[in-house]
Every structure is written in C-alpha cells, then in structure tokens.
Swiss-Prot record:
Catalyzes the decarboxylation of S-adenosylmethionine to S-adenosylmethioninamine (dcAdoMet), the propylamine donor required for the synthesis of the polyamines spermine and spermidine from the diamine putrescine. Is synthesized initially as an inactive proenzyme. Formation of the active enzyme involves a self-maturation process in which the active site pyruvoyl group is generated from an internal serine residue via an autocatalytic post-translational modification. Two non-identical subunits are generated from the proenzyme in this reaction, and the pyruvate is formed at the N-terminus of the alpha chain, which is derived from the carboxyl end of the proenzyme. Belongs to the prokaryotic AdoMetDC family. Type 2 subfamily. The keyword Lyase applies. The active site is at 112 (schiff-base intermediate with substrate), 117 (proton acceptor), 140 (proton donor). Its cofactor is pyruvate. GO terms for biological process: self proteolysis; spermidine biosynthetic process. The lineage of its organism: Bacteria, Pseudomonadati, Pseudomonadota, Gammaproteobacteria, Enterobacterales. The modification Pyruvic acid (Ser) is found at residue 112. GO terms for molecular function: adenosylmethionine decarboxylase activity; magnesium ion binding. This is S-adenosylmethionine decarboxylase proenzyme. Keywords: Allosteric enzyme, Autocatalytic cleavage, Decarboxylase, Lyase, Magnesium, Polyamine biosynthesis, Pyruvate, S-adenosyl-L-methionine, Schiff base, Spermidine biosynthesis, Zymogen. The gene is speD. Pfam families: AdoMet_dc. Optimum pH is 7.4. Active from pH 6.7 to 8.5.
C-alpha cells in the first residue's frame, strides 16, 4: 500500500481483541479447587501487568496509568492507558508479517489502552475446568496492535484462541480524501510466526468491506497428560481415559465452534 500524506493526526482506531482458553480435567472437588487456585495465581494482576507492560514496550507506547485488581474468589483485571510517542512515519513497518517476540517496534499512539480480564471457571459435575482471558489492545495512530499479537499468544499459551481485529473511523490525506484503512491485511494469520501456525488449526471469517477480521485457533495435538491436574493418565483405567478424553475434546470443540454439541 502506498504511503499516505495525512492532514493532521491519523484518526483511525485499530482494535485487537482476543480470548484465550485453557482447559483442564480435575477428578475431585479438591483438585478442581486446586486448579482454580493455581491458574488464578499464575495469571494474577501482577503477572498480567508485566505482560501488558512488555506489550507496551513492543509497540513503543508510553504508559500513563496502570489500574489492576485481583478479585475474590478468583479473577483479575488490568487496564493500562498509553500515550503517543512521536515517530517518523517512514520508520513504521506496515507490511503483513509476524510481530516480534519481543523486539522493539516504534509506535505513534494516542487515546489508546491495553486491558485484560481473567475468568477461571469450573462445574461440580464432569470434572471440567476452564480458564479464559480476554485481552484488548486498542490504538489510535499509524501502527496496528497486531504487532503485539505474536508475543501475547506465546505468553498466554492456550488450547483455544479467538481473535478479532477491526479498523474503525477514517483519516484524511492532504487532499481531503478519506481513508478507512492505512495498511494491507488479508488475514490475521499473516501476523503469526510459523511455529504458532504449526501448533494450531485455524479458520478465518473476514468481512473485508467492513475492515473486520476474525481468526479461530484450536490446538492440533492432544495429549491427555497435559490436561490432567494432579492425576496421571496411567493411574486411570482404559475406559476412564477414553471417557475423559471424549469429555475434554467435546468441551474444546464446543468452545471453538461457539455452540453446544451432542455427546458422541
């Protein structure tokens, strides 16, 4: 895409939001409580603040304010307000490729924010536990928050990821013509590294004329031992392993497709 000469500030708003899910099987009530306590501590407000602060570093934002809170009985939220950092637009990379892990990228941001909320969840029947984190990176300026996507997904390793990216508003060039997007994008997948693409099955649902892009990701490899909390698969009977595997896989497919499915 040809570089634009703008009249004034770049008024486009670029928002990246995604949900990550971690699935676990806990055999007893004590194990379920233990998993919730473990995942709640792993992604507490302090750790999330570190991750989001590093995200700000990647996209070159100045942190204005940090609001963070751990909740009882579980969950956490962090919101960071960031400000613009002047930069020569000629230095901004607008090509479609994966972002750093991490690597300094200079950005020009204004009226922007980064936030995350966590939602640990379990049910007394079935032994299934889920952890969901909602993350949003919203910027107003010349760089897309997609540059932080690669880093964030690697930091929050998960079984299922749903990603939405949208460009809103318009900016004008020096001739007064409106521009509703200022960079090329065909798929969110083009901003992911090859190792990530190898790990997940992905599907896109894009509405190009509205500048809306959506990608869903489901982990390819399924190893039961990675989904058990304080229970070893070898300590279970064959029928128990099959039953738990079927329950976990059904849970993951329901979350991935966003609908309830009949038992197989």
């Amino acid at each position: 895409m040809k570089k634009l000469k703008l009249h004034g500030f770049n008024n486009l708003t670029k928002s990246l939001s995604f949900c990550i899910y971690d699935i676990c099987y806990a055999k007893t009530a004590e194990e379920r409580d233990g998993y919730i306590a473990y995942i709640d501590e792993l992604y507490n407000a302090n750790r999330l603040t570190e991750i989001l602060s590093e995200t700000c570093s990647i996209i070159g934002a100045n942190i204005l304010n940090i609001a963070r809170q751990d909740y009882e009985p579980q969950g956490a939220s962090v919101t960071i307000l960031v400000s613009e950092e002047p930069v020569d637009p000629k230095l901004i990379d607008k090509t479609e490729h994966p972002g750093p892990l991490p690597e300094t990228v200079v950005a020009h941001l204004d009226k922007s924010h980064i936030c995350v909320h966590t939602y640990p969840e379990s049910h007394p029947e079935g032994g299934l536990c889920t952890f969901r984190a909602d993350i949003e990176v919203s910027t107003c300026g010349v760089i897309s928050p997609l540059k932080a996507l690669n880093y964030l997904i690697h930091q929050l390793e998960s079984d299922i990821v749903t990603i939405d990216y949208r460009v809103r508003g318009f900016t004008r060039d020096i001739n007064g013509m409106k521009h509703f997007i200022d960079h090329e994008i065909n798929s969110i997948q083009n901003f992911m590294s090859d190792d990530m693409k190898a790990l997940y099955d992905m599907v896109d649902v894009n509405v190009y004329q509205e500048n809306i892009f959506h990608t869903k990701m489901l982990l390819k490899e399924f190893d039961l031992k990675h989904y058990m909390f304080h229970t070893k698969p070898e300590d279970l009977t064959d029928s128990e392993r099959q039953e738990i595997t079927a329950a976990l896989w059904k849970e993951m497919r329901e979350i991935y497709y966003g609908r309830n499915m009949p038992a197989v």
